[in-house]
Amino acid sequence: MIYVYGDDGADANKERVIAVSVIAGREEWWQSVEDQWVVRCGEIPFHATDCESNHGDYEHIPNEENKAMYRDLTGILAASMVGGIGIAIDLTAQKKIIPGAMPLAYYRAFLECVEKAANVAENLGEVAELTFDISTENEYNADLLYSWARNGDARFRQWLAPKISFVPWRESVRVQAADLLAFEAWKALDHTVGPVKRTRRSWELLRATQRFETYSYSEDWFRDLKAHLDSGELENIVGFNESDYKAWLKTTGCQHSISNLFHFLGWISKKIDNPVTAP
């Protein structure tokens, strides 16, 4: 079994960048990380944003100690055998190029992380079991999206466990590690499109291992997406359009919501019997 742990990160107001990350490894790889992580963190469960900004549990700890904590935990990941990916999406670009678009950035990144987990599982020849941080905003919808993706793709069914799990980040060192990678992913993009442009040393250390990477989606990607939407090409690829969704809402008596959109995707996938395509 390959164990995959995930979390998300964003700027304080979730206005510029959002990212989702996963880190994967065999149990013995994870156990090595966990043993070192617990010793280094002591009684404070790690939270990347708070540690970096001296907030939350780190508010009354000297800045240099917090920076040393972050640096040491990054070093533990870099020296380990686990590997991961962070998917970051430029929310400012989305609002600029496709104003009024549904708030699907988190789920777009989440679904790509699921796909990457399946790739790792296939490469290692073992099924992947995914566990994410509990989020009152996204947990239910992420569960729906995972089920839709897995049920609609034979390769996903082969290499991904039937169910995704959710745990509180404070109770899982492994989710805390994914939180660090998610923080690095959104910072990497934010330092490209935001007011401060620089490369973080912590990210350079992780990237140098060639086991950690980030993908970013910004203006060029959203321009391509808008072109597909305007041309009708995307409709031909996915096999449905907005009118189909509205008709489904009317037939089922449902109101529009992200959850109902994912229920619709599950229904339409079964109807057209096509491979899954990311929303």
Q: Where on the chain are the PLM-derived regions?
A:
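Phosphate-ester processing/binding pockets and catalytic centers
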Residues: 1-279
